[in-house]
Design a protein with these regions (language model features):
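Contiguous, non-catalytic segments that form substrate-binding/exosite surfaces or channel walls
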Residues: 1-149, 348
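Catalytic Zn2+-binding segment of zinc metalloproteases
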Residues: 169-183, 203
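Beta-strand segments within the central parallel beta-sheet cores of soluble alpha/beta enzyme folds
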Residues: 115-121, 185-186, 213-224, 255-257, ...
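Short alpha-helical catalytic segment bearing the HExxH-like zincin motif
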Residues: 159-167
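Glycine- and acidic
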Residues: 36-44, 79-90, 110, 145-158, ...
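Hydrophobic (often cysteine-bearing) scaffold residues that line and stabilize catalytic clefts
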Residues: 46, 50, 93, 97, ...
């Protein structure tokens, strides 16, 4: 059924593109994602660099995880676990986690204190679970009130802390940019919006101890960095898979699965599904709903994560200077093209040759 649905989506999108004068859906998809300052060539160059220098680095972290777990061989099911004691969980009740978040933002900067006080005073954080509440977690913006709003379901896992860092990063940017009178400046491209959230995850690192016990603080810090690194090859794999699909819309479902299996060998060569038939036949991509619902929207996360790694290296050298740049990036919102925003903020473009190698060299010092 999933194969049948996706086949219809690919053919429909290809037909849309042809009616609009495109040879394939890909250029139309780029326009729909508002990519107005980079194109397929730049994305392909980014993926090439990831294959050359980032994949080997990520594979070394999988090997460290295998040794940490005490396994002779690590399978797909094993790699979801950080260490022999499982993955770190925060301490305290949901109310205490929210209070820790408030303390964190009060101490981080005057701007974040003002932001979080505004969120609390106006009840803009609906983060506690309750019966009949919808699942999920996200930040959205209420333009009539110039107010960010965060929705989540705290459940006692490290995901609760992720809400306090990642979603609050989105919300903080929305709060800072609220006074911009030009409405279109709020229409931020996804590759830019995710820099705000992913970078905040690193800027808040000195306060992780508020959410975890002493031992688990270090575990969470390492796990957070490891999983951010491990995501990059996967994100590129999702992107390259979609380019292949829309370049060859006539492919059968079986042929698409063969493409995925081939890409897994490039981006995640360690992968072993250990007898899970659905995944072994090349169907793992069907877990990624973006591929169905939001075509070509995934490399945005990779671009943003790489920029967040640049901020991490910067804050390790000079936290105040990195924070000043971050505030500037947030306030610029979408007033410039994405590549211009990076240049203005002092961040190297991930598309440029050598940037990803430099990022990996800095990350190697961390781990």
């Amino acid at each position: 059924k999933l194969d049948e649905l996706y086949d219809k989506l690919v053919k429909n999108r290809t037909l849309q593109a042809k009616k609009l004068g495109f040879e394939t859906y890909t250029p139309l998809g780029y326009l729909r994602m508002q990519r107005n300052c980079y194109g397929r060539e730049e994305v392909e160059n980014l993926r090439r660099q990831v294959k050359e220098v980032f994949v080997p680095f990520a594979e070394s972290l999988y090997e460290k995880r295998r040794k940490r777990l005490g396994l002779e061989h690590m399978t797909y099911s094993d790699e979801q676990v950080y260490g022999p004691n499982g993955s770190p969980s925060p301490k305290g009740t949901p109310e205490e986690i929210l209070a820790a978040g408030q303390q964190m933002y009060e101490e981080l900067s005057p701007e974040t204190k003002e932001f979080f006080d505004f969120m609390m005073e106006n009840e803009l954080l609906d983060v506690f679970g309750r019966k009949t509440k919808a699942v999920g977690g996200y930040m959205t913006y209420l333009p009539d009130y110039k107010a960010p709003f965060i929705f989540a379901n705290f459940n006692g896992t490290s995901g609760d802390v992720d809400v306090m860092t990642h979603e609050c990063g989105h919300a903080f940017q929305g709060y800072l940019a609220a006074e911009d009178p030009i409405r279109e400046h709020a229409d931020i491209g996804m590759e830019t919006a995710e820099i705000h959230s992913m970078s905040m995850e690193f800027f808040t690192e000195p306060w992780y101890h508020l959410f975890f016990d002493k031992d688990t603080t270090e575990d969470y810090t390492r796990m957070h960095l490891e999983e951010a690194v491990m995501f990059v090859p996967y994100g590129c794999m999702v992107d390259e898979f979609q380019h292949e699909v829309y370049d060859h819309p006539e492919m059968s479902p079986r042929e698409r699965k063969e493409v995925w299996k081939k890409l897994e060998k490039v981006y995640k060569p360690h992968m072993d599904y250990a007898g899970l038939p659905f995944f072994e036949k090349g169907a793992f991509w069907q877990k990624q709903h973006h591929i169905y619902s939001f075509p070509l929207y995934y490399i945005d996360y990779v671009i943003a994560q790489l920029c967040a790694f640049e901020y991490k290296a910067w804050m390790d050298r000079d936290y105040k200077a990195a924070w000043k740049s971050y505030l500037k990036l947030c306030r610029m919102s979408a007033s410039k093209f994405h590549t211009e925003l990076l240049k203005e903020a002092g961040i190297d473009s991930p598309f440029a040759d050598g940037t990803i190698r430099k990022i990996v060299e800095n990350l190697e010092k961390e781990v």
